[in-house]
Structures are given as structure tokens and as C-alpha cells.
């Protein structure tokens, strides 16, 4: 094997190149690769975090929708109950008003009956006096006539 000086020179140049590369080129490459892997890891973590937040947001939205539906149904049920209560109150008021009108009509009818009886008593008393006067063929004076009418009214 023939070793000559060019081989040693090539080895020295290679070692200088290796040292230069290790000293000046290799650290920025390692830093760039580390930064890149860190950015990728941060991006993946952010994506995972975003996905988790999205899932949480979906759950919150679903819960709020369910709550809104429940609230809506509750409000509808409350409105129906209030409407039914108002209808019952109106019905009760109408029945009370009808009973009051019937009672008033009965009272008016009773008053008319009493007035009619008084009028009939007066007429009957007057007819009785006239009949008695005609039977007795004598005239009764006005004061005696009024007293007789009052007595007959009281008796009837």
C-alpha cells in the first residue's frame, strides 16, 4: 500500500472540515431542528387544546340548548296553567253574576207580588165596603171609610 503525502493532506483537510462543521455548522442545524420540532410539538399541543375546547364548547352549547328547551316547555306549561286559571276565574265570575242577576230578579218579582197583593187588598177592601154599603143602604163617612179600609187591609 502506497501512502503518500496527498492522503495525509486530505485527512488534515477532512479533519479541519469536520472540526469546522462541528464548531460552526452543526450547532445552528441542531438548534433549527430543535426549534422546528418544538414548533411542531407546540402546534400539536395547540391543536389538541383547541379540539378539547371545541368539544367543551359543543357540550356547553348542547347543555344550554337543553336548558333553553326545558325553560321554553316550562314557560308554555306555566302559560297554559295561567290561562286555565283565568278561564276558571272568568267562569266563576260569570256564574256569580248570573246568580246575582237571578237573585235580583227574584227580589223584584217578590216586590211586585207584594205590591200586587197590597193593591188587591185595597181593591178588595174597597169592593167589600161598597158591597156592604149597598147592602146596608147607608152612607159611611170618609173617616169611617178610611178606618174600615185600613182594618180590611190589615186582616187580609
Curated annotation (Swiss-Prot):
Record's subcellular location: Cell inner membrane
Keyword terms: ATP synthesis, Cell inner membrane, Cell membrane, CF(0), Hydrogen ion transport, Ion transport, Membrane, Transmembrane, Transmembrane helix, Transport
Taxonomy, superkingdom: Bacteria
InterPro entries linked to this entry: ATP_synth_B-like_membr_sf, ATP_synth_b/b'su_bac/chlpt, ATP_synth_F0_bsu_bac, ATP_synthase_B_chain
Pfam families membership: ATP-synt_B
GO CC entries: plasma membrane; proton-transporting ATP synthase complex
MF (Gene Ontology): proton-transporting ATP synthase activity, rotational mechanism; proton-transporting ATPase activity, rotational mechanism
Membrane-spanning intervals of the chain: 7-29
Keyword Transport: yes
Topology in membrane: Single-pass membrane protein
Biological role: F(1)F(0) ATP synthase produces ATP from ADP in the presence of a proton or sodium gradient. F-type ATPases consist of two structural domains, F(1) containing the extramembraneous catalytic core and F(0) containing the membrane proton channel, linked together by a central stalk and a peripheral stalk. During catalysis, ATP synthesis in the catalytic domain of F(1) is coupled via a rotary mechanism of the central stalk subunits to proton translocation.
Family in the record: Belongs to the ATPase B chain family.
Database matches in HAMAP family: ATP_synth_b_bprime
Subunit structure: F-type ATPases have 2 components, F(1) - the catalytic core - and F(0) - the membrane proton channel. F(1) has five subunits: alpha(3), beta(3), gamma(1), delta(1), epsilon(1). F(0) has three main subunits: a(1), b(2) and c(10-14). The alpha and beta chains form an alternating ring which encloses part of the gamma chain. F(1) is attached to F(0) by a central stalk formed by the gamma and epsilon chains, while a peripheral stalk is formed by the delta and b chains.
Protein name per Swiss-Prot or TrEMBL: ATP synthase subunit b
Originating organism: Burkholderia ambifaria (strain MC40-6)
Originating gene: atpF
Amino acid at each position: 500500500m502506497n501512502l503518500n503525502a496527498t492522503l495525509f493532506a486530505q485527512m488534515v483537510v477532512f479533519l479541519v472540515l469536520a472540526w469546522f462543521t462541528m464548531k460552526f455548522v452543526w450547532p445552528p442545524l441542531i438548534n433549527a431542528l430543535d426549534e422546528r420540532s418544538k414548533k411542531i410539538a407546540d402546534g400539536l399541543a395547540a391543536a389538541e387544546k383547541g379540539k378539547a375546547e371545541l368539544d367543551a364548547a359543543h357540550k356547553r352549547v348542547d347543555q344550554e340548548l337543553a336548558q333553553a328547551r326545558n325553560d321554553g316547555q316550562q314557560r308554555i306549561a306555566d302559560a297554559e296553567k295561567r290561562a286555565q286559571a283565568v278561564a276558571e276565574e272568568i267562569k266563576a265570575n260569570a256564574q256569580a253574576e248570573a246568580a246575582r242577576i237571578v237573585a235580583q230578579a227574584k227580589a223584584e218579582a217578590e216586590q211586585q207580588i207584594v205590591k200586587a197583593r197590597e193593591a188587591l187588598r185595597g181593591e178588595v177592601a174597597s169592593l167589600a165596603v161598597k158591597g156592604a154599603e149597598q147592602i146596608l143602604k147607608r152612607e159611611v163617612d170618609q173617616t169611617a171609610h178610611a178606618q174600615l179600609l185600613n182594618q180590611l187591609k190589615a186582616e187580609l
